[in-house]
């Protein structure tokens, strides 16, 4: 039997790389020369970003770099850009990095959908635009938006429109215990009364505007930002609902010395809260949260022993406490996969608040 020969490095054959390319590596370029940008709008995989160049600010269209994988890029994101940053009609840059987000407003399709849908990053405030009539105000939708603002760490602002058609008092009374700031606007032959107060509230910050179609949100944006040309719609006489006119979120700079930005979003008909845990939902009802001290351990707030019933019956949450408790319970049931909340049902009238 032939003895085995000792092998050395000369016996190793290295197969040549047929493509002549470098082997794969997990190391990725750092892009230390990348330019900072701020995402203004997103459209079919293209990101319009504001960058500050030698000649001042200008807009750049970019695509997402492959290295980012499935990482999402949304309006309000602070990003790092490389490539053609000229802003010319045929120029296309690349988003190579998304910076850490300070806040993130998100929603889900419904209360049982596990997929979160990021809406706007790095905002300071959520302005909930609600018409007092035509279409009727939907209190439960307002409650949902307040929960989303609380969960995202955003300040909340109620902007009530069409006060020329109905008094804002009954609606505001329901939210008085929350101390949520508000502005009431009305249409007049000379324009929109209350617009200056809205502008003062928004100056120096990034504010997201949300609301049902038909509540006058796009009209408000066009008045705040002349030249914005956001399409306005009409309210269906039969359904009482508006038509979606804004099709994508868009950040617009507020004119004037105070500065600031508004992010106009498409009209919404639902605002799922599957991403918000029940305890956070309860905490976002501060007028009711104090009453939970009388609840038994592990209370679901929808059982006979719940202390919130006695708390609201005694007026602990104000005149609208009972209606607010029902809104909370509907949210919790919907999130648990039970009875669907009526945020998509026919409009809630002001009288339903209490």
PLM region spans:
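Short boundary/loop segments of OB/S1/cold-shock single-stranded nucleic-acid-binding domains
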Residues: 1-35, 82
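Short aromatic-glycine-enriched beta-strand elements
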Residues: 45-49
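A short macromolecule-binding patch
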Residues: 56-65
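A conserved segment at the C-terminal end of the G1
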Residues: 217-233
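Helix-rich effector regions associated with P-loop NTPase G domains
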Residues: 3-5, 30-33, 58, 70-86, ...
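Canonical P-loop GTPase G-domain recognition
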Residues: 155, 162-215
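Phosphate-binding glycine-rich loops and their immediate beta-loop-alpha structural context
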Residues: 115-125, 129-183
